[in-house]
């Protein structure tokens, strides 16, 4: 993970590369990181006896560097090569002005300079190259965007209007002058990024969120890690608002204070969600009235708010988030967040910074523990519907329709939450990324060539000569035995899928695989895993799935850039044609298919174990008869 990020940093474009310095800020003082820094030719800044988690590590790095601008990246955030050239120019705006007549940029004159115009932070959107848990667990890969896109691509950019953009801790550029003025990264919070942006704005600096994705990271891969991450965000935002008093500060505009008030109230909205779920249950099951009103009074107060909320979501979310998905996400997270938010607001603080795990520590993404509250609420909702409709007919059912609709509306969201927490198996170790790159497969002549390619220091010697030159399509009669052109369709850290123009004999197993053209072009060793023909619609193309190995460090570095310096291809908008019915049918069908697959695997393993036991019994019988013969022979002697 760290290799990918550091490698991408060394490939970033900049007019004068000598002014770009890349460092590992390591508060673990690990030998592996020291070795990796030396391997990639970048700096290493250790932080011994760090008592302040990420803030202490970053402040230590600030003390050991001098550049006027600092870009920060989390270990899993891989920057695009265009990151610096797209972000650094914003810091030049105080010295430049655009001519209204010609549109050309020029230096500001002394009279035009404004000392109050100071850029402190440029934040790019957070994006991810793997599916987030809502996409993955709900089998909605191409139906919904990443859950965090709504904040990064919509909310944070709208906060620009009040200069209340939030620093999200990674893929951002910060002014050193601004950091020195506010005393560095704040220590007494578990979300130092959010509080840093608050303090920069209160110091008179402009913070701005851009709309172009400049880095891709790794989403959390299991429900418990994601919930812990959200608890840290909730507690940290409340801590930072209390630490800075930003809601009541006159150092920022009134609109910015309202924005931060909304940030605080957002985390309390999960209480609203729980009340919204429990209210009809309490009335239908226990005759407890949360609100004592008539139907018309309810419609007068509820209907306008529902209408304006729906309209604002449609106008402001650009099809990234809908009211339905906001309800599903809030319902999923609410039971886990209400207690931490309540405690933090009362001043019972969480002071320990907990790093969010991004590596796959399990082959399941779900969590039964997080599912339990939703299961309980589903049982109560079903019981409430049955009790409330039992024995009612005609107009009695009509008068009860509001409560019944309310219960069913909440029940659907709860079923989504259960499906989410139920998780899904994750058989792959690395993420596949959709690509469209030229590929040339050069077949190698001997079956055992794979072992020759992967041993030693890198130069693989085949029966007919050295590893073929991937820069040319020409072949030697004594070396490669065939060249097959195609297009790489998807790639991962350990494999590539190539659509080939013509099939080749399956006896060919080892290949030199040339990938890409232009800036990134590399050749890797490939071992055929599967050769198959597509049966999807009219597509009758042949595909070759290959496992790859890198023969050198440089080869791996270029391959990583070819893989990650691109758009991810993951859905960025909601599928407008996808309905709740479609979701339910898809989730149920895929769950049944997964259960059948697991049953077949279990049955196959059981059969193999039974056959193995039979073979073992047979061998034991033969050994026993053989030993008996020896005993009888010894007795006869």
Language model regions located:
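Long helical/loop segments within the catalytic core of UDP-sugar-dependent glycosyltransferases
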Residues: 46-67, 81-190, 201-202, 223-265
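The conserved acidic donor/metal-binding loop of glycosyltransferases
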Residues: 74-78
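Short, acidic, metal-binding catalytic loop of nucleotide-sugar glycosyltransferases
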Residues: 7-19
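Structured alpha-helical
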Residues: 367-371, 396-637
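Catalytic donor-sugar/metal-binding loop of nucleotide-sugar-dependent glycosyltransferases
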Residues: 199-215
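A conserved acidic beta->alpha catalytic loop
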Residues: 15, 25-33, 49-50
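Membrane-embedded multi-pass helical conduit in multi-pass membrane proteins
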Residues: 266-351, 366-430, 435
């Amino acid at each position: 993970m760290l290799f990918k990020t550091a490698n991408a940093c060394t490939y970033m474009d900049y007019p004068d590369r000598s002014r770009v310095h890349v460092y590992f800020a390591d508060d673990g003082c690990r030998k592996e990181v020291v070795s990796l820094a030396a391997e990639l030719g970048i700096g290493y800044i250790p932080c011994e006896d760090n008592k302040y988690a990420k803030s202490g590590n970053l402040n230590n790095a600030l003390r050991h560097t001098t550049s006027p601008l600092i870009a920060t990246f989390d270990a899993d955030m891989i920057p695009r090569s265009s990151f610096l050239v797209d972000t650094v120019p914003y810091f030049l705006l105080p010295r430049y002005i655009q001519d209204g007549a010609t549109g050309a940029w020029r230096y500001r004159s002394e009279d035009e300079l404004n000392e109050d115009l100071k850029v402190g932070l440029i934040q790019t959107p957070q994006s991810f190259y793997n599916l987030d848990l809502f996409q993955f667990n709900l089998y909605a890969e191409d139906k919904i965007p990443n859950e965090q896109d709504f904040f990064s691509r919509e909310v944070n950019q709208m906060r620009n209007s009040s200069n209340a953009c939030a620093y999200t801790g990674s893929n951002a550029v910060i002014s050193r002058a601004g950091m020195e003025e506010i005393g560095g990264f704040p220590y007494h919070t578990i979300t130092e990024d959010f509080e840093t942006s608050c303090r920069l704005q209160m110091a008179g600096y402009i913070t701005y969120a851009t709309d172009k994705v400049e880095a891709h990271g790794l989403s959390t891969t299991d429900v418990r890690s994601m919930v812990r991450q959200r608890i840290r965000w909730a507690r940290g935002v409340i801590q930072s608002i209390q630490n800075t008093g930003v809601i009541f500060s006159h150092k920022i505009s009134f609109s910015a204070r309202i924005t931060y008030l909304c940030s605080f109230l957002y985390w309390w909205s999960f209480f609203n969600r729980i009340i919204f779920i429990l209210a009809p249950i309490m009335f239908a099951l226990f005759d407890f009235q949360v609100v004592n009103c008539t139907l018309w009074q309810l419609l007068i107060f509820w209907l306008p708010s529902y209408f304006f909320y729906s309209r604002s979501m449609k106008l402001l979310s650009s099809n990234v988030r809908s009211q339905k998905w906001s309800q599903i996400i809030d319902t999923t997270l609410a039971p886990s967040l209400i207690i931490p938010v309540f405690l933090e607001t009362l001043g019972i603080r969480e002071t320990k910074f907990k790093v969010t795990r991004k590596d796959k520590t399990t082959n399941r993404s779900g969590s039964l523990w997080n599912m339990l509250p939703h299961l309980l609420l589903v049982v109560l909702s079903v019981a409430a519907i049955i009790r409330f409709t039992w024995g009612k007919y005609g107009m009695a059912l009509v008068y009860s329709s509001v409560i019944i609709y309310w219960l069913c509306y909440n029940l659907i969201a709860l079923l989504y939450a259960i499906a989410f927490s139920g998780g899904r198996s994750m058989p792959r170790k690395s993420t596949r990324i959709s690509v469209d790159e030229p590929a040339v497969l050069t077949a190698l002549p001997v079956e055992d060539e794979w072992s020759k390619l992967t041993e030693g220091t890198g130069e693989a010697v085949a029966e007919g000569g050295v590893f073929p030159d991937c820069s040319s399509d020409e072949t030697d009669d004594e070396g490669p035995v065939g060249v097959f052109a195609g297009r790489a369709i998807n790639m991962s850290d350990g494999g590539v899928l190539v659509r080939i123009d013509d099939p080749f004999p399956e006896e060919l197993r080892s290949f030199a695989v040339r990938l890409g053209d232009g800036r990134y072009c590399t050749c890797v060793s490939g071992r055929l895993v599967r050769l198959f023909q597509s049966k999807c619609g009219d597509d009758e193309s042949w595909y070759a799935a290959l496992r790859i190995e890198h023969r050198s460090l440089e080869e791996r570095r270029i391959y990583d850039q070819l893989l990650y310096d691109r758009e991810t291809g993951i859905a960025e908008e909601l599928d407008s044609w996808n309905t709740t019915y479609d979701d339910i049918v898809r989730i149920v069908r895929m769950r049944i298919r997964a259960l059948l697959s697991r049953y077949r695997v279990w049955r196959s393993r059981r059969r193999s174990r039974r056959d193995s036991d039979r073979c073992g019994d047979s061998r034991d019988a033969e050994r026993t008869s053989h030993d008996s013969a020896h005993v009888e022979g010894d007795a006869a002697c």
